[in-house]
């Protein structure tokens, strides 16, 4: 049996969210750098250089890579032999970790979650609640993965329900010109 303190879960979630706000994964940096080295177009090379410079400055200054620090999604694998020391539910621990991360005085992250998105649309100002996916697994460990998904890419989006026989490529070719720059 493994005993996990509420505070350890909370702080782990908060630390992980701060970390991903200012560090790109190493494989991303490596891939952009390799593409930069191969690139022949000056404009494309300049764009990749800006990404690499921004990434370095964010890591050094511990500042967000992007102003849209996203909707938090947390993936939990909870071992069946895990016990909790404290009186908080797992969802409460995760959301307290999100709250601490987004309100951290040295690196306040942009809160963009609404408490009632279909009604009053009031910003929670701490980016809670998180989207939490929980899986109970054999064992005595807790595995926590966090992601922060920005919404900017959805600002210009379309949704379609296609029949199985419809062509996705045809729909994209027809729709893309109607979306503007």
Predicted regions and their residues:
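Non-transmembrane, aqueous-exposed alpha-helical and coiled segments at domain scale
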Residues: 1-181
């Amino acid at each position: 049996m493994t005993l996990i303190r509420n505070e350890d879960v909370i702080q782990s979630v908060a630390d992980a969210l701060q970390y991903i706000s200012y560090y790109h994964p190493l494989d991303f940096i490596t891939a952009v750098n390799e593409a930069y080295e191969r690139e022949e177009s000056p404009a494309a090379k300049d764009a990749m250089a800006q990404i690499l410079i921004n990434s370095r400055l964010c890591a050094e200054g511990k500042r967000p890579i992007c102003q849209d620090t996203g909707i938090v999604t947390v993936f939990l694998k909870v071992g069946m032999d895990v016990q909790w020391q404290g009186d908080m539910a797992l969802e409460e621990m995760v959301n307290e970790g999100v709250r601490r991360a987004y309100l951290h005085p040295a690196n306040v992250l942009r809160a963009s979650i609404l408490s009632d998105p279909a009604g009053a649309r009031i910003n929670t100002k701490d980016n809670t609640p998180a989207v939490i996916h929980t899986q109970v697994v054999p064992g005595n460990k807790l595995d926590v993965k966090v992601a922060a998904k920005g919404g900017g890419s959805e600002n210009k989006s379309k949704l379609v329900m296609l029949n199985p026989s419809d062509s996705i490529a045809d729909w994209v070719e027809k729709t893309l010109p109607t979306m503007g720059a």
